[in-house]
Amino acid sequence: MTDPAQNILDIRQILGLLPHRYPFLLVDRVTEYVPGEYIKGYKNVTMNEPFFEGHFPGVPVMPGVLIMEALAQAGGILVVKSTDTPVEDKLFLFTGIESVRFRKPVYPGDKLELHCRLLRHKLKLWKMEGFAYVDGKLAAEAVMTAAVTNREDM
């Protein structure tokens, strides 16, 4: 087995795996992954994020739903790297989110670390737990379920 730390993906590689684009691409780099097991990556949160203009003026805080979306995107990369399915033909859609907890606000300048671990996979459904950290402290956590579907079925 290869060293998980050798499984690094830069932004160009991530763009080849996810359909998301600015301003909705929320994973900047993958620092390690093991297909079928887990993934770690991060999002550099900057004041240039468009959502900070309205959330909240004078006290910018990253919306919790976007933290969840960042975790879901990291999880989507894990799913892609865990299958042989051509990514161009597929979409990964949230089907459920459980046990969501927001523990710490995320501010401009934070490096949002994204950790997802696969819990189970059956047919088109993938269930994983996700944890978001800032400076080693838990900012948010959730259990997420996603379905893999054909683009043409949408």
Curated annotation (Swiss-Prot):
Q: Which InterPro entries match?
A: FabA_FabZ, FabZ, HotDog_dom_sf
Q: Which GO-annotated molecular functions does the record name?
A: (3R)-hydroxyacyl-[acyl-carrier-protein] dehydratase activity
Q: Give its E.C. classification number.
A: 4.2.1.59
| Any coiled-coil regions, as ranges | none
**Record keywords, A-Z:** Cytoplasm, Lipid A biosynthesis, Lipid biosynthesis, Lipid metabolism, Lyase
BP terms from Gene Ontology: fatty acid biosynthetic process; lipid A biosynthetic process
- SUPFAM superfamilies listed in its UniProt record: Thioesterase/thiol ester dehydrase-isomerase
Q: Which residues form the active site?
A: 55
The answer to keyword Lipid metabolism applying to this record is yes
Compartment(s) where it occurs, according to its Swiss-Prot or TrEMBL record: Cytoplasm
CDD domains in the record, alphabetically? FabZ
**Which cellular component terms (GO) are annotated to the entry?**
cytoplasm; membrane
Q: Which reaction does it catalyse?
A: a (3R)-hydroxyacyl-[ACP] = a (2E)-enoyl-[ACP] + H2O
Q: Which Pfam families match?
A: FabA
- Domain of life of the organism in this record? Bacteria
Q: What does this protein do?
A: Involved in unsaturated fatty acids biosynthesis. Catalyzes the dehydration of short chain beta-hydroxyacyl-ACPs and long chain saturated and unsaturated beta-hydroxyacyl-ACPs.
For this protein, the record's HAMAP family field holds: FabZ
What the record says about family reads:
Belongs to the thioester dehydratase family. FabZ subfamily.
The record, for PANTHER family, names: 3-HYDROXYACYL-[ACYL-CARRIER-PROTEIN] DEHYDRATASE
Q: What is this protein called?
A: 3-hydroxyacyl-[acyl-carrier-protein] dehydratase FabZ
Which organism is the protein's source? Nitratidesulfovibrio vulgaris (strain DSM 19637 / Miyazaki F)
Originating gene: fabZ
